[in-house]
Amino acid sequence: MSLRINDIAPNFTAKTTQGEIDFHNWIGDSWAVLFSHPKDFTPVCTTELGYMAKIEPEFTKRNAKLIGLSIDPVENHAKWAADIEETQGAAVNYPMIGDTDLAVAKLYNMLPAEEPGTSEGRTAATNATVRSVFIVGPDKKIKLTLTYPMTTGRNFDEILRVLDSIQLTAKHRVATPVNWKQGDDVIIAGSVSDDEAKTIYPEGWKAPKPYLRIVKQPK
């Protein structure tokens, strides 16, 4: 069964480049970004993990932890990290899971479809994960899922933007419009009546339509 937003993120234990972890305990009171890549020592993955290393401080500012995953053993991850630093100019400073038995990949549906049949008999020797992303909240619930094909590198600035939106809307009864970024105007949630909105936003709001109430981003 596929995982959906608001499902509890399945817990697991796994070997990583920073030691064995229990996923829920590792998250603690933080947010988490779990992302898979197809294979170590491959070009697109090298650019992705290098860029994530560069922007990791931005996630830390937001109380969010990063953790990567592929079917490769942690020993390969450690060797590959040197190539990433050399070519991308950033040292991988977050743990990477060595999911050699595909346990986490199957748990999080990170494997591509197989025609015909299913993924039941797959082994790490013959399979690779697609480019999946899961944002998990401190409540251990899934807040976002994204899946990219193996041939397309992800836009991790977009993951950061979505995290900003998720954290903002968890705190305030607002929604973020198309192409929103930190500091832009937001939309008052439909669940907030006009009377409630007058109390929350005494300065008022713009409303080109009654259902489209635009206000400055709350602090």
Describe the residue ranges of each PLM region.
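Chalcogenol-based redox active-site neighborhoods
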Residues: 1-219
